[in-house]
Amino acid sequence: DPLDGTKEFVHRRGDFTVNIALVEKGIPTRGVVYAPAKSRMFFTQADGQSVEEIGDFAKDQLGETKAISVSNPDNSALMVVASKSHRDQATDDYIGKYGVRDMTSAGSSLKFCLVATGEADLYPRLGRTMEWDTAAGHAVLNGAKKISPTLTLSPMHRALI
């Protein structure tokens, strides 16, 4: 997805991303999520581990990286990240079932990356979504050792992260 978070981009909010993914047999195996306005880039390495590039970005060489990992959440005090543009009553009702310590909004596939880094514990997405919007973030999340919830959906169509 060359521009995920179009509304955020148009309204000059920094939560848009550029996404690149490799999907093999329906499974997102490699992903890159770049948030240029936030100077953050996350990607899955060849060994499957996800990292965040930190420091100055150089177009000709990879900068310093750090491994990322999901949090070990306290289910009675979750940090929730939800969509700015696609939040609805069903999402609010779902969030209401959990003990929420704090909640933040973010746009684009950046939400996947906030869960992948442990900055958030839960990203509920109950509405329709497209593969090109989720594949890169899903791969980054998988590489951060996130175990996706068991749902009766294919790996590319999980509703809850």
Indicate where each model-derived feature is located:
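Oxyanion/phosphate-interacting regions
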Residues: 71, 92-97, 111-161
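Short glycine-centered, acidic/aromatic-flanked micro-motifs in structured strand/loop junctions
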Residues: 2, 82, 126
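Flexible, acidic active-site loops/lids enriched in D/E/S/T/G that coordinate Mg2+ and/or position polar
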Residues: 1-24
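Short glycine-rich anion-binding loops that position phosphate/pyrophosphate groups of nucleotides
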Residues: 4-5, 86, 129
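Acidic beta-strand-loop-alpha-helix segment within the catalytic core
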Residues: 19-113, 154-161
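Short glycine/threonine-rich catalytic loop with a Thr-x-Gly-x-Asp
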Residues: 9-10, 104, 134-135
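Short aromatic-hydrophobic micro-motifs that form the base-stacking/packing surface
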Residues: 1, 32, 124
